[in-house]
């Protein structure tokens, strides 16, 4: 496995862009207040600007009419509000939207998933990923770099603006954010935590801590550190009932095995209010790899001391992967075993797979658009070759 990324990298906060200006999307509220103090202004000005930035998705200082013109002009000289731009949009038949978003000369993917009672945004934390999970398309890209705060919160800002942020109402349709896009969030704590702070801040997006979820594959020291930094909902990418299987499909397990990982999860739960006492277990269903009835019994025994709910995820294929999707009958049988043990078990409905926006598929189109044709063939779909 590739060397893990150092989570203690120098923070990108308050580093001017090439044009010499500070991108205010890089600053959480405390940092924003410090920025205004350094300008000789009152700290409450930071709250006013943040409200315009996040409640109304404004990137124009001239819109901020409750701020005097002298200060607006001063801000234009030293600061900017620059979110990453959408360079491609794809819409699924089920309403899911996937955006390819430019971050410098690279791209990450962000997915909007509407449901009857909520709208969830799946956000990326890195360009690529270092963890090399064998069933994940993003892992095939390898790791490139961590995203800045502005590139993480900027995905939420851009999506909110696109799907209906309006100054007239001050409402935003995005109700939940999940850090489940490209990358391992715990390997970019320096930037992920301030971005999540903005998501939670009343002058930011104002989301409940129960509606912001971080998903991790198990970087244990960083998980312990996270618990001292912020309280958000936690989901863990477990995907195996024992170390033998997990070593193979989630290589970080060789460094931090399941027992070590789950102990860290329980430590996090002891500190957290956001999780309401239990963690979400993510378990991708791989045909004849981790989906046997015996595996379900092993999983139940493994999790008996960890309060949790379990999401079973039908695997989404991509070219070159040596796996198949578990049949519905195998998934149902697996689920029944877990429910018989008393676990809340949900089979996740696949969303956006027709645009490669489903779990484990992000980065497919960015790497090679022709792979979408191959994926559809793997799923037995009819394709219009001229449209590819």
UniProtKB/Swiss-Prot annotation:
InterPro entries: Aldolase_TIM (IPR013785), Methyltransferase_A (IPR040072), RlmN_N (IPR048641), RNA_MTrfase_RlmN (IPR027492), rRNA_lsu_MTrfase_RlmN/Cfr (IPR004383), rSAM (IPR007197). Its EC number is 2.1.1.192. The lineage of its organism: Bacteria, Pseudomonadati, Pseudomonadota, Gammaproteobacteria, Enterobacterales. [4Fe-4S] cluster binds at residues 129, 133, 136. Keywords: 4Fe-4S, Cytoplasm, Disulfide bond, Iron, Iron-sulfur, Metal-binding, Methyltransferase, rRNA processing, S-adenosyl-L-methionine, Transferase, tRNA processing. It is found in: Cytoplasm. It comes from Enterobacter sp. (strain 638). Binds 1 [4Fe-4S] cluster. The cluster is coordinated with 3 cysteines and an exchangeable S-adenosyl-L-methionine. Pfam families: Radical_SAM, RlmN_N. Specifically methylates position 2 of adenine 2503 in 23S rRNA and position 2 of adenine 37 in tRNAs. m2A2503 modification seems to play a crucial role in the proofreading step occurring at the peptidyl transferase center and thus would serve to optimize ribosomal fidelity. This is Dual-specificity RNA methyltransferase RlmN. Residues 115-354 form the Radical SAM core domain. Belongs to the radical SAM superfamily. RlmN family. The active site is at 109 (proton acceptor), 359 (s-methylcysteine intermediate). The gene is rlmN. Its cofactor is [4Fe-4S] cluster. Reaction proceeds by a ping-pong mechanism involving intermediate methylation of a conserved cysteine residue. Transmembrane segments: none annotated. GO terms for cellular component: cytoplasm.
């Amino acid at each position: 496995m590739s060397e893990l990324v150092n989570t203690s990298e120098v923070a990108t906060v308050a580093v001017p862009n090439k044009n010499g200006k500070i991108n205010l999307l890089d600053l959480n509220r405390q940092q924003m207040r410090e920025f205004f103090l350094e300008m000789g202004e009152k700290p409450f000005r930071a709250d006013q600007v943040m409200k315009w930035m996040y409640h109304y998705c404004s990137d124009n200082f001239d819109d901020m009419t409750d701020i005097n013109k002298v200060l607006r002009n001063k801000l234009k000289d030293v600061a900017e509000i620059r979110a990453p731009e959408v360079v491609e949009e794809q819409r699924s038949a089920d309403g899911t939207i996937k955006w390819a978003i430019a971050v410098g000369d690279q791209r990450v993917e962000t997915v909007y998933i509407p449901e009857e009672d909520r709208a969830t945004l799946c956000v990326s934390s890195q360009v690529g990923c270092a963890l090399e999970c064998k069933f994940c398309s993003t892992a095939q890209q390898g790791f490139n770099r961590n995203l800045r705060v502005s590139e993480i919160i900027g995905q939420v800002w851009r999506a909110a603006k696109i799907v209906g942020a309006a100054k007239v109402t001050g409402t935003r349709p995005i109700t939940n954010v999940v850090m489940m896009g490209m990358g391992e969030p715990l390997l970019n704590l320096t930037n992920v935590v301030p971005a999540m702070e903005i998501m939670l801040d009343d002058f930011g997006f104002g989301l409940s801590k129960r509606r912001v979820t971080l998903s991790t594959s198990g970087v244990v020291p960083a998980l312990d550190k996270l618990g001292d930094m912020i309280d958000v909902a936690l989901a863990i990418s477990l995907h195996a009932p024992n170390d033998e299987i997990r070593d193979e499909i989630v290589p970080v397990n060789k460094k931090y095995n399941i027992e070590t990982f789950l102990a860290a999860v329980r430590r996090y739960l002891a500190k957290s209010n956001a999780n309401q006492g239990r963690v979400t277990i993510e378990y991708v269903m791989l045909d004849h790899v981790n989906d046997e009835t015996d595996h379900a019994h092993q999983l139940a025994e493994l999790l008996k001391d960890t309060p949790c709910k379990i999401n079973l995820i039908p695997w989404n294929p991509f070219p070159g992967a040596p796996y198949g999707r578990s049949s519905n009958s195998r998934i149902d049988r697996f689920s029944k075993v877990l429910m018989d043990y008393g676990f809340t078990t949900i089979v996740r409905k696949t969303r956006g797979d027709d645009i490669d926006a489903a779990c484990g598929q992000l980065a497919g189109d960015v790497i090679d658009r022709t792979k979408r044709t191959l994926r559809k063939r793997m799923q037995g779909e009819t394709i219009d070759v001229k449209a590819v």
